[in-house]
């Protein structure tokens, strides 16, 4: 229901004026300082947009730098034991400002007043001369797949028990009981593979393709899928352009990009049928599904309207929207959290992180059981069985913990740590603590640091309690290097950093208040992903490099962690370029789900692309390659070629005694015993 304003317009204006007049513009944000830096560094820089997992911002570049590293989630709350009011949660950074408390809005007008105040703060800065040096641009902040553990489980547990009960592989789950989405799913009889805006499906048996269809075929690009309780859940993104609107100042107009995250619910089987749809405003961030059937979806919303263009009664212009079977609704005010005080950031738009929950066991699984919208953005998402963590930031990372229980989302605590997280595997909840590894750019206050030209890095591993207060930390490892991958196994963390070599650190976390480095093992190249192979073996996959740190191809390494104080590499396999004009790459370097890892069946597979550039001709070879591991050595099994132009396998799954390689244009099957081709089908 639309709310009425609690205060008159004149009263608000007086308060806004009082706040604005009391603030000073920082020296580094004065127009002359920004102009010097932009003249030096911005030039013709291209700005990349990743529509899959981004917190998207269409704002002037100079203002973007001030906003991007701000504490977007520094305003989270924790409840007191009575649950009656919000309390400020102490920051994990000893030298950081305390985190402002948040509250649920009483009505929509309170949300309107908050963003109007933020807009006027931004307008004040612009009127002081910033418009002379601002250039319109787009910044897309990566939320790299972008964190995970259980008691002696987590991403490190092999998750064999559930797979032993079925004769087909599934997406590797980093946290036991928390299921991961992917672009391929199977029920053992049918394969569903998402490519662009289409789902390629095949009914299979014993390596044969009995029937194939294509469905979905909407305008939205498919991001992820789940297969649960005979329901196929398809998550996709729709990117749209709005009409020109005023942006803050009179006659200052722009066309805006806005995104929706869509979920389509289908029956599973050979011929899926649509049973319902849900649309949530905002760009898709991430999703999780607990094994009891509750799905949690995260998106980021940002609207760009000047408050001059609408009144508080026009709530549809600033309140997050969602729809069930195309029936449009708006998030209720008592589900919208805003800071009690306007933050010192340059918000000139209404930005929210939206979290929705669904019960997939219900008769209408497309009806949300809960929706929470929080002022700010979300980046990397990590989920344990009982808690969902949202992070955001670069110079500092803001962390917010939400409890999740049977489709109910409840904000609990927030905190802050130095640096940025590499991906979701950089975090682990274990025995009442959250462990989080970060990289700090020690020159990130300089413009060299902003543009990524600095090599001055430090790395931290924090241990936080459930109120996200610091219990312990260790730092100063991997100096001048950045974290590439993290693997937590119980009380031990394994962290890979890289600049020239690949140090693998083993860190003892048995005393949460006093983490200790047990060993540092160096090897050329780096592992971008690590997964437990067995109790004493750690599998690493990443990029190979020479002694100077120049990347040469991809590699597979088996580490012996029997004694964490004496790490070693038992075997390494590299696929490198042979000539100067060759390039070897693998999607698995940045997307670990492209790998097939099955310790029970003793098989490891990943896609490889080899490009050759010569004066006479260019050559491209794409294949999926397989290895086994036995007695301290990798053994080459075979590689399945993809002979179609401009196509590459990027997934493989096992059903029974057969493995299926998948791409956007074709499926291929092979006998597990010999890994020889059985059949292929094109789409």
Model-assigned labels for residue ranges:
Residues 34, 56-57, 61, 82, ...:
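General helical structural elements
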């Amino acid at each position: 229901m639309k709310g009425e304003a609690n205060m008159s317009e004149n009263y608000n204006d007086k308060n806004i004026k009082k706040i604005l007049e009391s603030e000073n513009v920082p020296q580094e944000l004065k127009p002359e300082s920004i102009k010097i830096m932009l003249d030096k560094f911005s030039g013709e820089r291209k700005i990349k947009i990743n529509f899959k997992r981004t917190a998207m911002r269409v704002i002037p570049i100079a203002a973007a730098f001030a906003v991007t590293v701000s504490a977007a989630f520094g305003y989270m709350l924790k409840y007191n034991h009575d649950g009656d009011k919000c309390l400020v949660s102490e920051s994990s950074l000893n030298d950081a400002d305390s985190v402002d408390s948040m509250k649920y809005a009483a009505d929509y007008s309170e949300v309107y007043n908050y963003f109007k105040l933020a807009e006027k703060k931004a307008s004040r800065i612009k009127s002081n001369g910033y418009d002379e040096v601002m250039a319109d641009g787009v910044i897309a902040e990566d939320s790299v797949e972008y964190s995970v553990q259980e008691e002696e489980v987590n991403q490190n547990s092999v998750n064999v028990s559930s797979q032993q009960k079925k004769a087909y592989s599934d997406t590797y789950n980093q946290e036991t009981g928390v299921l991961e989405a992917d672009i391929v799913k199977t029920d053992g009889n049918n394969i569903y593979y998402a490519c662009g805006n289409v789902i390629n499906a095949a009914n299979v048996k014993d390596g044969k393709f009995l029937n194939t269809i294509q469905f979905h075929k909407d305008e939205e690009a498919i991001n992820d899928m789940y297969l649960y309780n005979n329901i196929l859940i398809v998550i996709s993104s729709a990117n749209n352009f709005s009409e020109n609107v005023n942006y803050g100042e009179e006659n200052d107009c722009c066309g805006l990009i806005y995104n929706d995250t869509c979920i389509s619910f289908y029956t599973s089987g050979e011929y899926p049928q649509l049973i319902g749809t849900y649309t949530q405003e905002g760009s898709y961030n991430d999703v999780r599904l607990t094994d009891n059937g509750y799905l949690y979806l995260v998106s980021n919303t940002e609207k760009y309207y000047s408050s001059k263009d609408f009144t508080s009664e026009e709530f549809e212009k600033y309140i997050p929207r969602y729809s069930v079977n195309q029936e449009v609704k708006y998030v209720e005010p008592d589900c919208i959290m805003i800071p009690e005080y306007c933050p010192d950031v340059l918000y000139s738009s209404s930005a929210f992180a939206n979290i929705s929950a669904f019960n997939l066991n219900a008769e209408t699984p497309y009806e949300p059981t809960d929706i929470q919208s929080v002022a700010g953005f979300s980046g990397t998402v990590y989920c344990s069985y009982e808690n969902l963590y949202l992070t955001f930031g670069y110079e500092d990372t803001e962390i917010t913990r939400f409890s999740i229980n049977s489709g109910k989302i409840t904000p609990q605590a927030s905190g802050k740590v130095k640096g940025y997280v590499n991906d979701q595997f950089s975090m682990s909840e274990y025995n009442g603590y959250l462990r989080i590894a970060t990289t700090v750019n020690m020159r990130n206050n300089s413009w060299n640091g902003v543009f990524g030209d600095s090599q001055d890095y430090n790395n931290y591993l924090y241990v936080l309690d459930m109120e996200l207060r610091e219990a312990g930390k260790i730092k100063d490892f991997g100096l001048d290097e950045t974290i590439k991958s993290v693997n937590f196994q119980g009380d031990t963390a394994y962290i890979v950093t890289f600049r020239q070599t690949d140090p693998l650190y083993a860190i003892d976390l048995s005393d949460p208040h006093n983490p200790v480095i047990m060993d540092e093992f160096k090897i050329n190249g780096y592992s971008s992903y690590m997964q437990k192979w067995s109790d004493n073996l750690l599998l690493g996959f990443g990029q190979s490099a020479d002694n100077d740190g120049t990347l040469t191809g991809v590699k597979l390494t088996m580490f012996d962690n029997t004694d964490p104080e004496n790490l070693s590499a038992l075997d390494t396999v590299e696929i490198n370029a042979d000539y100067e004009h060759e390039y070897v790459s693998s999607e698995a370097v940045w997307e670990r789900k492209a790998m097939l890892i099955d310790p029970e069946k003793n098989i490891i597979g990943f896609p490889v692309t080899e490009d050759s550039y010569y004066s006479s001709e260019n050559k491209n070879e794409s294949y999926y390659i397989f290895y086994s591991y036995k007695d301290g050595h990798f053994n080459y099994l075979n590689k399945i070629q993809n002979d179609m132009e401009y196509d590459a396998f990027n997934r493989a799954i096992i059903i029974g005694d057969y493995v299926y390689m998948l791409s956007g244009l074709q499926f291929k099957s092979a006998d597990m015993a010999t890994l020889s081709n059985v059949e292929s089908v094109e789409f």
